[in-house]
Amino acid sequence: SLKLCGICNSRKMISGENHIETDLWKSILETSPEVTDLEVFTGNIIRQNLENSVFIDVTASNEPVKHYNELLSNNIAIVTANKRANTQDMERYSQLHASAARRNTPFHYETNVGAGLPVINVLQSLINSGDQVIKIEAVLSGTMNYLLSEYDGGKPFSELVAFAKENSYSEPDPRDDLSGTDVARKCLILARECGWSIEEPDIEVEPLMTEACAAAKDVTSFFEVLKNYDTPFHDRFLDAAAKGRRLRYVAVIENGKAKVSVMEVDEAHAFYSLRGTENCISLTTKYYQQYPMVIKGPGAGINVTSAG
């Protein structure tokens, strides 16, 4: 059975000896007099030395990541949805994974890529079995796939982006999605899992917006500037459609190099039929060359992500 022994957010924490009622954690945390101090919080976890301790990180902050090495070195397992640990510079990344391997401490981060899809586990299993990754093609953004799969030329691209924002299909500032940065970070994680030593700046990124959109002073201004991209995007859509192809935002990893960009795919491609916020990963390996392994499913959602 799972026993909750500590919990914190950016403001308050509970880190005593007593177990916390899981159905009351929210109210208990809100009334806690303890101000969050991750140094104290992680120190208490190590000091308590409970059997089968697990540190769970569901933030997007770099602060918890600073304590990963110490936790792993003290046999505290880590389960994290936070991509920052696996996208920091290669030296720190290597140190972190060495800490986990040295003590054989579990370090799980499946949801870093593909929400609840079993991407990381499958990749690790293939490599551990002696397989060798030749190429990865992946649609890794539910937001990007929604925009590109739903666009049919009937309404401007800027209106579709606005609809995605209003319905929480995108980040509050859609530029966080359209910049391609999040996809690049997921791409970086996959490349490193394959054994390639690369840094985030090494990845070639094509944003799904103009430089003027990125430079807009706020979200309102961004949407005004985005209207100027409606016609160029429509022309690109029509050009692909005339060849029987569809546009997809794809990460490609091959020969130690990585790129994320808009790609045209034909009906024979695994990404052609993707709809909504689906993610899809195609793995071409030594054992799966003629018919690449394809992993496909929801790329977003509370239930599937938490299950991952």
Positions of predicted regions on the chain:
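Catalytic, metal-anchored helix/loop core of enzyme active sites in primary metabolism
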Residues: 135-137, 145-148, 163, 169, ...
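Substrate-binding/catalytic subdomain of NAD(P)-dependent oxidoreductase enzymes
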Residues: 150-151, 159-273
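Conserved active-site and cofactor/substrate-binding residues in soluble primary-metabolism enzymes
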Residues: 50, 91, 114, 118, ...
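Rossmann-fold NAD(P)-binding glycine/threonine-rich loop
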Residues: 61-73, 83-111, 115-126
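General beta-strand structural signal in soluble alpha/beta enzymes
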Residues: 54-57, 78-81, 107-111, 135-138, ...
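Rossmann-like NAD(P)H-binding beta-loop-alpha module
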Residues: 101-104, 108-170, 177-182, 188-189
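Short acidic, glycine/serine/threonine-rich loops at helix termini
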Residues: 16-22, 90-93, 118-124, 148-152, ...
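N-terminal glycine-/serine-/threonine-rich beta1-alpha1-beta2 phosphate-ribose binding loop
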Residues: 1-73
